[in-house]
Amino acid sequence: MRTPSQTVGPYFAIGLSRRDESALAPRTDPAALTLVGRLLDGQGVGISDGMIEIWDGARWARSGTDSEGRFGFTVTKPEPAPGSVPRFDVWVFARGLLRHQLTRLYFPDEPNETDPVLAALDDEGRRTLVAAAEDGALRFDIHMQGDRATAFFEH
């Protein structure tokens, strides 16, 4: 028997850990990448009390969003799963969600056209899952709704 889900908010951020869990690599690692983004609602307004988790097999990191919806991580590129390209699974937690949402983050410098999941999406869906190189970092904005909505997956 499944227990019904309930929304996360409105006081979701109160329970967030205050320790820094946003690094999968030390900033001094020559292979370290800075990953930044914003969690945005359907009107493009930052969601201030969300939490983003990224997963790569056994590795994971977590970042709460700030007052503008910004989040950030220090990562190294993950090893690809068999038949895939390097990527992170991205879990989104925010007020108003009955269940956390799952999406993926792909890297712009990989042969993403060979990934079977990306190949199954239309051009717009694929575009929402590939981070953009910007000012020495990777940017990955997550749009929960609207014209620029990020592609999410059932889980």
Q: What residue ranges belong to the model's regions?
A:
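Beta-strand-dominated extracellular/periplasmic modules and repeats
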Residues: 1-128, 133-155
